[in-house]
């Protein structure tokens, strides 16, 4: 299917919401006739605020989760997975209700007792890389080689916001992110950069502006992210 169906014959038990973050609300609205209070909604869009954005819109139960995957849209309804990278991270609260399903489907997964920390661990990297590749118009490996100090500075800004939000990422999280970046191909793109180049909708608000708003709430300066967002918005 290329859009949400409103003709389901019964209420759905579990819904994996695999849209872009800016499409999630519309997708959820399209499913409204198929949801009940017992339905489990699992959004896996990039970002750390999916649950807080979606829960007020439905009586179904929304849970935070994230996915590690490298893929891109071929056409509506067809997504190509580009590498073997795949891992679904879910909250421990969903283990009993979802593990049998995930094992049967052959999906690599793990359950976490601190899902917010898992979200921010992924977000630290994808936010920094997504915004910097888009700002400079170069791949991830090139960002690391040409703008090493700025990349490290941006990672530190995001790390600081996470701490202010009560998310205690490991002390070496930035070092690990830099190490990952150092191993990436020079021309490796990010989905945010690709979407902005196409002039389509993008996750800029989720990956960049969200951090600026949170920084202001906590009185934190984010000059690098502010500069990038002002150019890209």
Language-model segments: which ranges?
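Rossmann-like NAD(P)(H) cofactor-binding subdomain of soluble oxidoreductases
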Residues: 1-78
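Short, flexible turn/loop "capping" segments at secondary-structure junctions
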Residues: 9, 80-83, 185
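A general structural signal for well-ordered alpha-helical segments in protein cores
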Residues: 12, 24, 50-51, 95-99, ...
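Residue-level detector of family-conserved "landmark" positions at structurally sensitive sites
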Residues: 40, 65, 112, 172, ...
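Glycine-rich beta-alpha junction loops
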Residues: 46-48, 66-71, 94, 115-119, ...
């Amino acid at each position: 299917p290329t859009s949400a169906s409103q003709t389901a014959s019964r209420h759905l038990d579990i819904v994996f919401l695999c849209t872009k973050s800016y499409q999630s609300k519309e997708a959820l609205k399209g499913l409204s006739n198929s949801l009940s209070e017992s339905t489990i909604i699992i959004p896996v869009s990039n970002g750390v605020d999916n649950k807080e954005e979606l829960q007020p819109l439905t009586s179904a139960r929304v849970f935070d989760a994230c996915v590690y995957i490298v893929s891109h849209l071929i056409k509506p309804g067809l997504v190509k997975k580009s590498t073997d990278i795949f891992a679904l991270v879910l909250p421990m609260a969903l283990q009993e209700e979802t593990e049998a399903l995930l094992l049967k489907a052959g999906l690599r997964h793990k359950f976490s007792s601190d899902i917010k920390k898992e979200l921010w661990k992924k977000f630290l990297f994808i936010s920094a890389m997504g915004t910097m590749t888009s700002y400079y118009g170069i791949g991830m490996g090139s960002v690391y080689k040409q703008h090493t100090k700025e990349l490290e500075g941006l990672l530190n800004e995001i790390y600081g916001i996470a701490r202010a939000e009560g998310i205690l990422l490991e002390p070496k999280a930035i070092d690990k992110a830099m190490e990952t970046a150092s191993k990436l191909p020079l021309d490796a793109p990010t989905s945010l950069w690709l979407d902005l180049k196409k002039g389509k909708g993008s996750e800029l608000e989720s990956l960049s502006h969200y951090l600026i708003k949170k920084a202001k709430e906590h009185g934190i300066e984010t000059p690098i992210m502010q500069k990038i967002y002002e150019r890209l918005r």
